Amino acid sequence: MLEKVGCGAIAIPCNTAHFWSSDIANALTINFISMVAVTRDFIHQHNGTDMDNLRTIVLGMEANIQRKLYGYSAAGWGGAVPDVDSIQQDATRVIDDVKSGNISRARFKMALLVARTRSLKPDAIILGCSELSSASRDIFKGTDVIDPVDVLVDACISWFRNS
């Protein structure tokens, strides 16, 4: 339907929806701007290497971690894997707070979560759930926290300007 009214591209700002991104893209006759693909490209451009060569921590729902949308976040962590797993469980609690409308508590927990995550010195921290994006608006300084929603917005603007 969007195609019939002149939409030139579709983007979905939800990591979980990208489980079906190939099905979605194959069903379209217009461009599908994949949040996962543009985020992986962004990280590659800013780190000079593929994500598989970086120590990353993906924060998100367990399903997103298991599906490895952004690669295997426990790679290269050795004995710190239990800490990474615990951090990801804390991310789920932030997501639950956002979904229940408790944004101020979610923002507080999110700040603590990112500080704890940074203590492990990852190359990148990826917000693998759009609820985490909404809980993190403007509270982070630095380039280590990657918000796929922000990357997707930039990619959509770039697509629009170039089409």
Task: Give names to the regions the model predicted.
Residues 1-163:
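Non-catalytic structural scaffold of enzyme domains
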